[in-house]
Every structure is written in C-alpha cells, then in structure tokens.
C-alpha cells in the first residue's frame, strides 16, 4: 500500500460555527490538522479580542481528549473597528488575523466593510503591528456577473489596497481564478493566497451535473475548467505564496437543500485526503507537504508543527451524512462516494 508522511498540516481558512455544531466539525479538523485559522463570521460576528478568546475556549472544549489542536483566531473587520481593538487583538496572543468581508459577499457578511476607505486607519495599525489581513476577494455590485466578482475585486479594491499599504501582509483567501493566481504571483512578498480542495478538484459543471447540486455551491462560486487548471498549477508549483485553506463551511441539510440554499462546501471530514487527490492527479505529491504544512506557517511567522501524519492510498466511502444539529444532519462533500486517500 502506498503511503506518504507529512509534517502535520494546518488549515488557514476554516469555519466551525458555534454551539452544537462544534461537536461534529471540530473533531474532523483536529484529527488532521495541528492548527486552523478560525473564521469570525458568526451571528453576531466576532469583532473584538475578548469575543475571540471566548470563542476559542468553546472550540477547545470540543476537541476530543488526547488530540492536540490549536485554534488560531481572527476578527471580523467592520466599518466601526477601531485601531485600539487591533492593539488588543495583537496583545491577546490568540488573534493572528483580521478578516475583510465586503458587505453581502458571503454567509453572515452583512456587517462587513461597505467601503475600504472607512478602514484605512485600522489597516495602517495592522501594517505597523504586522497583523495579517485576510480578504474575501469579491465585489458585490449588482451589475457585476457573479463569475467576474473576483477579477473586478482585484482591479477595484485589492490592487489599490496593496499599493497604498505595501507593508501590510495580505492573504487573498480561497482564490478561484487564473487572474487571482497571477496577481499573487506578481505581487510583493507580503501577498499570499489560500486555495481550497474543492476549487482544485471541481469546476462549475459540478454545480449542474444531472441537476442542481446544492452541496457543490460555495462562494466564491466554482469557476470554469481553465481557472481550475490555473489553481492546480499555482498550488503545485512550489511557490511558497500559496498554501492550504479549506474554507470548509458546514451547513445543515435543510439549509442547503432548499429554495434559497446557503453557500459552502463541507470538506473537513476528508480535507487533507482531498488535497492529496488533487496533488496526485497533478503528479505533484512531493510538493504537498510544502503547500499543506510549511508555506502557511512561514507566512504567519510560526514554526511548522512538530508532529507528523501518514496518508495511505486506501479508498474509503464517505458517509451520506453526519449528525449536526439535532435532527438536521450535515451532508459532506463526496457523500456516499469514495476518497482515494486515508489518514492512518
């Protein structure tokens, strides 16, 4: 049986929700990853260091006994965030990033930033302190096609932001287009990007294969095949600017399979295994460790994890659902289908 050994990876973009949901989703991540950057888009959002520390404690309480897992926290940037709150976040030692959501761009983003000019003072403080800005890179104007939101965001928001704050460390989250990959490659050393497993494995045809596929609907939405190939090329290139961020986003079956379903693919149950598939398909398994375990910590100024994990080429069937919210289950990516790699 073929096996590969990796330094234990980290997930630099993860949603775990709150309350009863934590008991299902946190163990999936803790089994595979040493650390994960937790997204702050709860309702209400995590906007202060104090709230982040309380949320961190709730996450840690859901980690199974004997598992070593460290949640790294982020704050939700709003028009009203103060530079002083950035100071408190930095001093907490637990908050490592601030997340920019353009208002209305994704799940629970209605409190997001309405105009980037409103947070310039905060960005200046972050630049001074070395705090990372994580960016959901889509505009939300009604006249912009949903498949073009990322490219327009680069032109209208991200490129001017990087030019104005050249020392600000920026992660372009869950990139989905060739234009985004090219922007990151061409930018200075303070700009990096996360790439999800589902954007490496799927193109937008997957949303419509034989009917509407709500469990393949995410934001940013899956793009055409040329973009998927560009993402694979970037992720497997060995360029340290690209690293693992699952954007695993749990929603209950009822919230997904409905007239107006939520955006998000749940991948935490098989995250590193799905990345292994993508890298194997690209003939680049030898570059998986750098992407999954080394590049992210290096950008965030952290040491790699000391532990290792082993993956075996041993196919397994993904359950059709996981218990989630009382009688409303969670449907994972590849439900009822097989994943080629297994964590031993």
From Swiss-Prot:
Residues binding Zn(2+) 1: 13, 15, 99, 247
Reaction(s) this enzyme catalyzes, per UniProt: (S)-dihydroorotate + H2O = N-carbamoyl-L-aspartate + H(+)
Binding positions for substrate per the UniProt entry: 15-17, 41, 136, 219, 251, 263
Location of N6-carboxylysine modifications: 99
Alphabetized UniProt keyword annotations: Hydrolase, Metal-binding, Pyrimidine biosynthesis, Zinc
EC number in record: 3.5.2.3
Cofactor dependency: Zn(2+)
Active site, UniProt feature: 247
Gene Ontology biological-process entries: 'de novo' pyrimidine nucleobase biosynthetic process; 'de novo' UMP biosynthetic process
Pathway given in the UniProt record: Pyrimidine metabolism; UMP biosynthesis via de novo pathway; (S)-dihydroorotate from bicarbonate: step 3/3
Taxonomy, superkingdom: Bacteria
Cofactor note: Binds 2 Zn(2+) ions per subunit.
Gene Ontology cellular-component annotations: cytosol
Binding site for Zn(2+) 2: 99, 136, 174
GO molecular function: dihydroorotase activity; zinc ion binding
SUPFAM superfamilies: Metallo-dependent hydrolases (SSF51556)
Enzyme's top EC category: hydrolase
InterPro entries in the cross-refs: Amidohydro-rel, DHOdimr, Dihydroorotase_CS, Metal_Hydrolase
Family recorded in the similarity comment: Belongs to the metallo-dependent hydrolases superfamily. DHOase family. Class II DHOase subfamily.
Record function comment: Catalyzes the reversible cyclization of carbamoyl aspartate to dihydroorotate.
Subunit structure: Homodimer.
Protein name: Dihydroorotase
Organism per entry: Aromatoleum aromaticum (strain DSM 19018 / LMG 30748 / EbN1)
Gene: pyrC
